[in-house]
Amino acid sequence: MFITFEGIEGSGKSTALARLKDWLQEHGHGATLTREPGGSRLGGILRSILLDIGNDDLTGETELFLYLADRSQHVHQVIRPALAEGVAVISDRYADSTVVYQGYGRGLDPALLHRLNDVAVRGLWPDLTLLFDLEPEIGLKRATTRNLREGTGATEGRFEAESLAFHTRVREGYLTWAALNKERFRIIDAAASPDEVFEQVRSAVADVFTIG
């Protein structure tokens, strides 16, 4: 069982991730949480480069190859071994983020990015992808508030510092990409309350997998 969470900044993925892991474990399924970038040792180093607000001169192409390196190592060291042991893997972002952020957001070719992703992951695609959909203005406000509260604006806030126009392209890109990949995408209304959001998540997972 391989589930990925996608969405714009501040869409509430992290809270729902933890609740899904607990729910799966309560129903007898081993589960582990991971993230991109940063799910492996190398990924942690790359995350510090990619998200640091001081690195605002990175090109879309530079971002692309750093994310692909992170993803390849993540799949090899974390995701495949866990799946081989029968553990459910729940990842906060995966390959679709690159298609959307560097493709629809930065203007690179989404189809090319999908092919490069397939090389990086060696054909390992999620069984289910949950897209947390939210108006960019709301998401940015949430994310900025979180970074201020946690003191992570400088080290984790590079994408939050992008323009509203960029985040609007990202949101629209996610919806376009989800429509092109309907077989594994489910859209979550991330503007709902945390409990309502999790109920949508639980229902989507139960529709795809046999739980309990």
Curated annotation (Swiss-Prot):
Query: So where does ATP get bound?
Result: 7-14
What is a single Pfam family found in this protein's UniProt entry? Thymidylate_kin
- Name its GO BP terms in alphabetical order: dTDP biosynthetic process; dTTP biosynthetic process; dUDP biosynthetic process
Print the keywords alphabetically: ATP-binding, Kinase, Nucleotide biosynthesis, Nucleotide-binding, Transferase
| Keyword Transferase (UniProt) | yes
Q: Which gene encodes it?
A: tmk
What species does this protein belong to? Oleidesulfovibrio alaskensis (strain ATCC BAA-1058 / DSM 17464 / G20)
The record's annotation in InterPro entries points to: P-loop_NTPase, Thymidylate_kin-like_dom, Thymidylate_kin_CS, Thymidylate_kinase
Q: What does this protein do?
A: Phosphorylation of dTMP to form dTDP in both de novo and salvage pathways of dTTP synthesis.
Task: Please identify the protein, giving its name as recorded.
Answer: Thymidylate kinase
